Amino acid sequence: RTDAIIEIAMRPASQVPDLPLDFAKLSLFDWMTCGIAGTNEPLAVKLRQLAAGEGGQPLATVLGGMRVPPRMAALVNGATSHALDYDDTHFAHVGHLSVGIYPAALAIAEMQDASAEEMITAFLLGAEGAIRVGMTLGRAHYNHGFHQTATAGAFGATLAAGRLLGLDSLQMRHALGLCATRASGLTSQFGSMGKPYNAGISAANGVECATLAGLGFTSADDGLMGHQGFVGAHLPGGGAVTGPDLALDSYKFPDNKYKLHACCHGLHPMIEALQASEAAAGVPLDDIKSFSLSTNPRWLAVCDIKRPRTGLEVKFSYNWLAGMTLRGDNTADDRLFTDTIAGEAELGRFAE
C-alpha cells in the first residue's frame, strides 16, 4: 500500500491531466491570498521572530518578508496561511491540504530553482497522496482528536518535497517512514494559535523528512502502512491496515472546497441557511427568543465553542456566528473576527 502512495508522487508530469492541475493552481492562489492576509496576525509575527532568532541560510522566502532555511520557511508559511482559517478544505482527506503542503513545496522549489509548473505538479501529487492517507485513517482518526491537516497532510508535504528534491522510490519510502515518526497534530488546539501551528508542523515535517532521506538517512522499511506503522498505530485497537484502493486511477483533489466565510467550514451551512432565510430579517437580536438549527453531530465537537474568548475562538462558535449572521455582519471579512467581537454584550445575550 505504501508503494501505491510512492508511485503517485513519482508519476511523470506528462501524465498529469489539466483539470486537477487547474484546481492546484486555484489552490495556490487561495493559499497565497490567505498567507499574505495572515502576515499581521499575532501568531505569524511571533513565528517570524522565532525564525529571525534562529537565523541560518537564506534559501527560502517567508510571507511577511525575510529569507530563512527551507524547513523554517515551511513552518512559518504553513501557520501564517492557516491563521485566518480561511483556506480550502478537502472533506475526504478531512483537512486542509494547501496550508500543509504548499509551504513545503515552495520552500524546496526555491532552493532547487524549480519552475512554478514543477512546484504545482509536486503539490498536486503530494495532495493526492495525502488524501489517500487521510481516507485510510478515516474519520475515526479525526473524531479521536487527531488533526488530519497535520497528520495525513505531513505525508503529502513529504511527497511534494521529495519529488522536488529528486528522491528515488527507495529514498521516498525512507522519507515517508521518517514522517511517520514525526507527523502530529491535535484538534484540541482548535480556536487557538495551536491550530494553524499544526499546518506549519505538517509543512516543516515534509521538508525535514524529504531532505534527510535525500542525504541517505534511513527509516523502518514501511513506517507508514507496515506493522506498527503510522496508520496501524492510529487505527482503533491497532488493527490491520485496510481501506480504499490507493492507486491513482482518478484524481481526488478536484473535490477540494473553498471558503466563502472566514471561519470553520462546519459553520458555513448554518451561515448560508440563515442568510437565505427571511424569518428573522431585520429583527434585533435582543428580540429573538429562540430558534433551532440542525447539523451533523460531528461538528459539535469541532466548532461549538459556547462562549468564545478570542477572535480565533469566534471562528469556531455556532452561537456567535449565528448572532453575527442574523444581525447582518459580513462574515466573509476576516477583519471582523477580533477579540473585541468575542466580548460583545449583544452577542453574549443572544448566545444565552
Where do the protein language model's features map onto the residues?
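Short connector loops/turns at beta-strand edges and beta->alpha or beta->beta junctions
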Residues: 81, 100-102, 107, 129, ...
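Glycine-rich, mobile lid/loop segments that gate access to catalytic sites or pores
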Residues: 110-113, 117-208, 215, 220-227
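Terminal-appendage/accessory-domain detector
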Residues: 1-94, 191-204, 211-352
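Short amphipathic alpha-helical face segments that pack within enzyme cores
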Residues: 27, 99-107, 128, 152, ...
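Hydrophobic alpha-helical hairpins/lids featuring a short glycine-rich hinge
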Residues: 77-135
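Short helix-coil transition sites and intra-membrane helix breaks within transmembrane domains
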Residues: 93-98, 146-151, 260
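Active-site catalytic microenvironments for nucleophilic, acid-base chemistry
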Residues: 107-111, 164, 273-276, 328
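Residue-level detector of well-ordered alpha-helical segments, enriched
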Residues: 24-28, 100, 118, 122, ...
